[in-house]
Amino acid sequence: MCGTDTGEETVMEYIRNEKNVKIAEAICEAIHENAAYLSEIDGAIGDGDHGVNMNKGFLMARERLRADMSFSESMKTISRTLVMDIGGSMGPIYGTMFSRIARACKQEEKLTKEVFLKALQDALQGLQELAGAKEGDKTLIDTLAPAIRAYEQAMQEGRSYAACLCALQEGAEAGREHTKELVAKIGRAARLGERSRGYLDAGATSCCIILTTMAHQMCTDILEK
């Protein structure tokens, strides 16, 4: 998990936007490390190429990241790369997710937990508008939506930034696991109907990897301050 700090917030906590490319780098590396796993999951009820396509896009994005980039610039770089260079439907989908995060953080010097919540909420809204999917359709939204709820609940309880990020991770993992119980309503897997039940959704799984990696690196930044 992201760290051991689960107490109440006692100081102003934030992540700097300027010259903060480490989070993007960690996400790209995590997708690379899990490429075979993602394709294996996708092969059960999909095309079996999710890991290949994701790895291709994120490796290209990693090559375009610069050490002097801000967090928002690095998110925009990932977005542009995925939209332009990744295959299948996931390029526009994840491109939208990272674009919305970048846009929400662009003008912010300090990425507080409130700023990050807004970025996540904007990302979710963008995905829903683009794909027409909703929670329960067995998509990455089934990871993102519960992750946001868990994060926001921790915020409302007055928890520290690190604790909110831990809650985000837990919500993402629970959402991913819940897709096993769902019947696919969108994409190729939807053709299988009830036969799609019992399997993880590949998009929900890659989204979980992205969110948990992002939270872990952000938490590391906070605790090292």
Set out the residue ranges of the language-model regions.
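N-terminal loops that bind phosphate or other acidic moieties
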Residues: 7-225
